[in-house]
Each structure stands twice: as C-alpha cells, then as structure tokens.
Amino acid sequence: MYKASSVRYEKMSYARCGDSGLMLPRVSLGLWHNFGDTADYGNMKELVFTAFDNGITHFDLANNYGPEPGSAERNFGKILREELGFYRDEILVSTKAGYEMWDGPYGNMGSRKYLLASLDQSLKRMGLDYVDIFYHHRPDPETPL
C-alpha cells in the first residue's frame, strides 16, 4: 500500500481558483495519452505517486481520454481506490466532456443531456461519488451558455 511523502507540500505553491475556495497546485498532472489501456499500469501508478509526493494534488482527466475513450478515468479510478483512497480529501479530480463518446445526436458537444450523462459515466468509471471540477471540454456553437 502506498504511503505519501510527509514533506509533499513543502515545495509546491498553490493558488486560489476563482471564488471556489479550491487551492490548485501551480502544476497539475494531465492524464490524456499516458493513462490509456495501452500504457503500462505500473508506470501509471509510479507517475501518480511521484506527482502526489511532490505536492501535485490536481489530476486532470476527460471522458474521452485513453486510448480507448474512458480508459484513463478507469485506470486512474483504480489507482485512487486501491492506493490513494486514504488521501482522497487531499486530491482534486477534474474531468471534462465535449468530444464524441457514443452514437446519435447526444453523443458529443454540449447539450445538457450529453454533459450530465457524461458526468454520470465518468463517476462510474472512476468509482467516485463526485469530482472536484467538471469542465466543458470545448465550445458548442449550437448550445448557448
């Protein structure tokens, strides 16, 4: 079982994120192509552990990250459950949606249906009850903000 460094917050600086109350590290770890099913799972764990041991508390994902869309969330969720669960309150998990995930008129872009369904699916893949930040991945010219 992973045990985090006791000095993990000594070198990293953090900045307030708007009015949210969240403090984001100056460096976050994006998990796009390095957490898909084609990557080595042992390397994924070491990358997350090294980041967290150095004060990186924000892990950025998306519903389509892989390769194989969704696999980055699934792999990160497994690491979180099996190794980092004790530290969940110290970790910021963000995910996003906006790119194609399934067939039909609600499989991408920015409809309310797509975004809510994507968030629900992301939570299931990661085995989480919530994410700390949910982004819209790209503008949708057909859906007004």
Task: For the regions a language model picked out, list residue spans one by one.
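Feature marks short, surface-exposed loop/turn motifs that line or immediately flank catalytic pockets
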Residues: H33-F35, Y65, Y99-M101, H137-D140
